[in-house]
Structure formats: C-alpha cells, structure tokens
C-alpha cells in the first residue's frame, strides 16, 4: 500500500495558490508594479488555471491515500468516515472565512458610504447553502455564489468528495486491469473535456463549465495516481522524470507567452489549452527526483504548501478590503516606492493571515473533528493482509499524508 506525503506535490500547491493570488491581485500590480505586471502578463492573466491544477492534485492525493482502503469493496461506514475526514480538512477554514466575509459585508452597510455589492446576497437561504457547501450546485456561473470568492471551488470539491466513494471503486477495477501506460493515457483523456469545450466555445467560463472542470480534472488526477502507484522507477528514471517535469513547466510557460503573442482567433481564452499538460506535470513531479521536484520538496516550500489552502481562502478578503478602502477614502496605489511597499504589505497581510488560520484554526480544528469519530474496523488488518487497512489506520497528519483540498 502506497501512502505518505509526496513533498514535491505539497510544494506544487503553493505555486498553484500564488498563481491564483496574483491573478486576483493583477489590478494592484498594474498600479504599483506595472513593469512586473507587463512582463508576467501571459502567466498572470491565466492564473485561474491554478484551480484546475488543484482539482487534479486533489484527485491524485485522495486516490494515493485511499485506493487500497476504499477501492476493493464499498463500505458505507468507511465512506462516511472518509467524508468526515474531508470535512475536517476544509470546513473549519471555510466557515471562518465565510463568516468573516459576511461580517465584512455587514460592516460596509453600517460604516462609510460604499456598501458592498454583495449586500443583496445576505439571505437566509444563501447562508444555508454556503454553510452546507452546496451553493455552487444551483448556479451555472460561480461568480457571486460565495461571499468569499474562492469558496466556490470548495463547493465543487465537496461534490467530488461525495462522488469519490463510487469513483474509487471504478478506478480500483480499472487499475487492476490496466497497465501504467494505459492509465496515464486515460488520465490525459479524462482531462480533455474542459479543453474541448474551450475549443468549441472559445471561452473557458461558460454556463456550468465548472462542472466538467471539477469532475473530469478530479478523475484525471485519480487515474494518473493509479498509474504512478504501479511504477517502481529506478534512480536514473526518477532523475529523468525530474528533468521532464522541469521541461514541462518551462513548456507551459513558453506556450503561455507564445499564445499571448499569437492568440488563436477563435479561442479567446486560449491560455486554457495548457491544462492538457497538467497531468504529465503532476505525474513527473510525483515520481521525479532532483531539479524541480527537489526544489518543490524543500522544507520552506512544503510548509508553504501546507498553508496554501488558508492563503487561497483568505487572500480575497484582503483584496476586497483594500478595494473598499480605495473607494471609501479615495486612495491611490502609485508606482513609486511607497506604492510598492504598500502592495508588499498587502501580500504580507494575506500570508500572515494564512499562517494564523493554519495554526489557530485549520490544524487544531482538524484534530478536534477527527477525535469525534472512531475509525471503522477492518478485519483485513486483523488477518495480517496489510498493516494499514482502515481509513484512519494511517495517521493523517502533515508528516504522513498529502492534504487534499482545492486551496
């Protein structure tokens, strides 16, 4: 049974999170650091693709940790236990940022002359939907579904978690009958529907486009994980995979710059085409050594990967607060030294908020929620067929597994 943290993928999480953060902070970068914004425009303008990378990572990580324990046969108790463990990962930070966002909207209604545009969404039904993580399920577009903007992807992730109990049964049987190479090609194929829709419409953001994004990217992550689990690469092969991951990352960046200079006339969001390279990137990082995998596996990168979910959830609150202050107090973010210092301060506040959320909310609440459930008994463990057969027979902390969240 393969479990344990793949550090390079933990490090990849912070890369994806920062990609999304910079995407949302583009207007601020344009004002305070126009040269930086212009130089990195092809990469920053498609930062929303970081969410697709998160979806693939989530499917990979859950399959990495649960394929053997949930794939052989269905167990309602094990599935419910799994879902509670998933909630313990995402719900605490999600609920805190959700309520902070709601309180901020109320604050703007009572202080100053610039009420939040989201004030009309403060309804009882909207609260219940967001509390239960189902707000996105009723909307064709994710904009405006959540008081804390990035929370839409957590609602999408929750749908994937609910489907995982059935998906893992299918993946287990496909993996049993398919070689690693076949599983890899299936994973690439599973990641294609959002790209095909993009090519058909020219837009990445269309009605209900979030649904194939989460379902198919999550499934692609699960399939490529099943492929990786079958591999036993030599040291030389691992080094080769590491070099391949570096080349893939460079290729993704190169394609983004090429598409920026030579846009496809019929595809407005042509940068979304790079999604087809995410599955190969994740797979090579998972088995690779040296170069890019080694850099992403450094302790600071792994720690930042651990707090990436909190950063993902809190950064838009900082951004929204600043936008309100600009209108309320008629502030301007200049390109001088003071403007750059203020921009760095906003980033620092977001990171500090993420650190506080991780240490004061995310980890303590996760452990508290886990303590409420007894692990499901698995007789296979008693019979000696595996040393880790129950869902929480593996100690699911930061030292032993990769976190599986869209953030």
Feature-to-residue mapping (PLM):
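Acidic, glycine-rich loop-and-beta core segments that form the ion-binding/anion-interacting portion
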Residues: 204-229
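Perimembrane helix-loop-helix junctions
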Residues: 72, 230-231
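Short, amphipathic, aromatic/basic-enriched membrane-interface segments that mark the entry/exit
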Residues: 151-154, 208, 239
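Alpha-helical transmembrane segments of multi-pass integral membrane proteins
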Residues: 48, 214, 218, 222-223, ...
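The cytoplasmic-loop to transmembrane-helix boundary for the fourth helix
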Residues: 182-185, 238-243
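Membrane-cytosol interface segments of multi-pass membrane proteins
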Residues: 1-196, 214, 295, 302, ...
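Membrane-interface helix caps and helix-loop-helix hairpins in membrane proteins
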Residues: 143-148, 199-209, 258-268
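Membrane-embedded alpha-helical segments in integral membrane proteins
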Residues: 105, 192-199, 251-259
């Amino acid at each position: 049974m393969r479990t344990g943290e793949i550090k390079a993928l933990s490090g990849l999480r912070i890369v994806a999170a920062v990609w999304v953060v910079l995407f949302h902070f583009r207007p601020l970068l344009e004002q305070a650091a126009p040269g930086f914004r212009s130089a990195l425009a092809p990469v920053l303008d498609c930062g929303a693709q970081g969410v697709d990378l998160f979806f693939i990572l989530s499917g990979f990580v859950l399959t990495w940790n649960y394929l053997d324990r949930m794939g052989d046969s269905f167990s309602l108790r094990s599935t419910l236990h799994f879902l509670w463990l998933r909630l313990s990962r995402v719900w605490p930070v999600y609920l805190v940022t959700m309520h902070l966002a709601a309180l901020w909207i109320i604050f703007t209604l009572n202080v100053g002359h610039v009420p939040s545009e989201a004030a009309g969404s403060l309804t009882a039904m909207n609260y219940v939907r967001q509390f239960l993580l189902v707000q996105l399920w009723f909307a064709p577009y994710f904009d405006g579904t959540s008081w804390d903007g990035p929370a839409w992807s957590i609602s999408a992730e929750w749908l994937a978690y609910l489907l995982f109990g059935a998906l893992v049964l299918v993946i287990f049987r496909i993996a049993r009958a398919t070689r690693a190479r076949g599983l890899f090609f299936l994973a690439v194929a599973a990641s294609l529907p959002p790209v095909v829709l993009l090519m058909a419409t020219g837009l990445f953001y269309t009605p209900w486009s979030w649904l194939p994004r989460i379902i198919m990217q999550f499934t692609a992550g699960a399939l490529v994980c099943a492929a990786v689990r079958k591999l036993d690469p030599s040291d030389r092969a691992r080094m080769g995979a590491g070099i391949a991951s570096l080349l893939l990352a460079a290729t993704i960046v190169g394609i983004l710059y090429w598409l920026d200079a030579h846009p496809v006339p019929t595809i407005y969001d042509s940068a979304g085409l790079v999604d087809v390279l995410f599955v190969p990137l994740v797979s090579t990082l998972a088995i690779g050594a040296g170069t890019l995998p080694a850099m992403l596996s450094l302790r600071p990168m792994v720690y930042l990967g651990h707090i990436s979910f909190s950063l993902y959830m809190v950064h838009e609150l900082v951004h929204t607060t600043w936008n309100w202050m600009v209108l309320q107090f008629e502030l301007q973010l200049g390109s001088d030294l003071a403007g750059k210092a203020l921009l760095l301060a906003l980033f620092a506040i977001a990171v500090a908020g993420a650190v506080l959320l991780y240490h004061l909310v995310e980890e303590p609440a996760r452990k508290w929620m886990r303590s409420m459930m007894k692990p499901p008994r698995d007789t296979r463990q008693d019979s000696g067929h595996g040393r880790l057969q129950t869902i929480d027979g593996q100690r699911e902390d930061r030292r032993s597994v990769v976190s599986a969240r869209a953030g």
